[in-house]
């Protein structure tokens, strides 16, 4: 994610309960950090694709209507844990001169507690991974410690990741504390499985659903990072990475990191396709054209040619299905063809197919491809099944 934060791995301070109670920062000579960590947001302004959530939180802070607990849900890599740390930073933001008297979302500079909070080593911001600390004893420790005032910050903030992994007994032990916590305590929960969280817990929290980030937003974000890193990258390559990430910022940064290493600093679309095991987009469209014209011999020949150079039959069919979906969207929403996340060839030819193919044909192709993908995935000879 694009941001001013520059966190490092805490080298000390994790006690046996799973909480990080503070530790020493790393030495000045730091090893290489992956892009997902290097460009992790440190303020609400740095978050991308979550405007609705940021607006609600901003208004809550401005009006003083700050709840005792938040629960953040969404797919992997959209910023749940990062948002939790930013909330903790905003709650405890203080300047050395004492000019900030209460919680604020306006954090232009690093405050007294900011660095330690974003590095997950502040003694008043306690993080617990519920995936490895699922029992009632872990929650009892929170219940016992929450009564004590924070040591140095304004609030004691408990961040519990993957909260849906807590046991039923642990959730039940939490209810009273969660409903009536001390004024100095705040809770932030993060989960990818909101349906597994008991309604009794949800009713005590303010819920935010973090959305998948649109491909064009991811492309712009990756382009900004490429500029900062001094990396040359083709726009089409950014589009491929953005679509492959499926709305996950962390996934897009991980793939971009891998692409930079794969291409030795100059990221091209063909190199990214090779890295991801994708078929050449032009050849996928040629295969689609043969199928649309009913030229089965040409379609078989094109598929065999792609298979012979290493294309996975499942990937070829999935790419075909994705292109059918794109053409269908262009047919009903012509502006879809202006999305820069798709290559120029894909957009131009997509418009042409949308104009000449009927909805009935596109729908039939979509249904057949979905069935074909399912069959090929379980076939002993995928190429023959395709």
Question: For the regions a protein language model found, what residue spans apply to each?
Answer:
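Extended, largely alpha-helical regulatory/partner-binding modules appended to the mid-to-C-terminal parts
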Residues: 21-23, 97, 106, 113, ...
């Amino acid at each position: 994610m694009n941001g001013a934060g520059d966190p490092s791995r805490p080298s000390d301070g994790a006690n046996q309960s799973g909480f990080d109670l503070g530790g020493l920062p790393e030495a000045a000579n730091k090893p290489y950090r992956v892009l997902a960590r290097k460009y992790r947001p440190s303020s609400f302004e740095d978050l991308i694709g979550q405007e609705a959530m940021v607006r609600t939180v901003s208004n809550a802070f401005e009006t003083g209507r700050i709840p005792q607990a938040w629960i953040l849900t969404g797919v992997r890599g959209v910023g749940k844990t990062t948002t939790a740390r930013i909330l903790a930073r905003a709650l405890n933001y203080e300047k050395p001169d004492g000019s900030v008297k209460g919680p604020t979302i306006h954090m232009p500079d690093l405050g007294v507690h900011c660095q330690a909070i974003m590095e997950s080593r502040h003694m008043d911001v306690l993080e617990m991974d519920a995936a490895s600390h699922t029992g009632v004893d872990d929650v009892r420790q929170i219940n016992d410690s929450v009564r004590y005032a924070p040591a140095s910050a304004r609030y004691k903030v408990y961040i519990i990741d993957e909260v849906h992994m807590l046991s039923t007994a642990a959730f039940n032990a939490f209810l009273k504390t969660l409903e009536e916590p001390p004024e100095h305590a705040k809770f932030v929960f993060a989960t990818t499985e909101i349906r597994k969280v008991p309604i009794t817990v949800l009713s005590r929290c303010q819920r935010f659903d973090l959305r998948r980030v649109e491909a064009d937003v991811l492309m712009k974000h990756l382009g900004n990072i490429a500029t900062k890193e001094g990396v040359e990258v083709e726009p089409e390559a950014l589009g491929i990475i953005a679509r492959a990430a499926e709305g996950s910022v962390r996934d897009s940064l991980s793939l971009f990191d891998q692409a930079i290493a794969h291409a030795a600093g100059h990221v091209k679309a063909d190199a990214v396709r090779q890295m991801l095991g994708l078929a050449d987009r032009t050849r996928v469209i040629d295969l689609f054209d043969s199928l649309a014209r009913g030229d089965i011999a040409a379609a078989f020949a094109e598929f065999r040619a792609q298979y012979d150079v290493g294309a996975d039959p499942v990937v070829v069919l999935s790419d075909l299905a994705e292109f059918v979906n794109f053409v269908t969207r262009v047919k009903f929403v012509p502006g879809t063809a202006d999305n820069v996340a798709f290559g120029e060839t894909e957009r131009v030819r997509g418009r042409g197919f949308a104009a000449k193919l009927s909805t009935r044909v596109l729908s039939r192709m979509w249904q057949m491809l979905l069935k074909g993908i399912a069959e090929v995935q379980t076939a002993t000879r995928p190429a023959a099944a395709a």
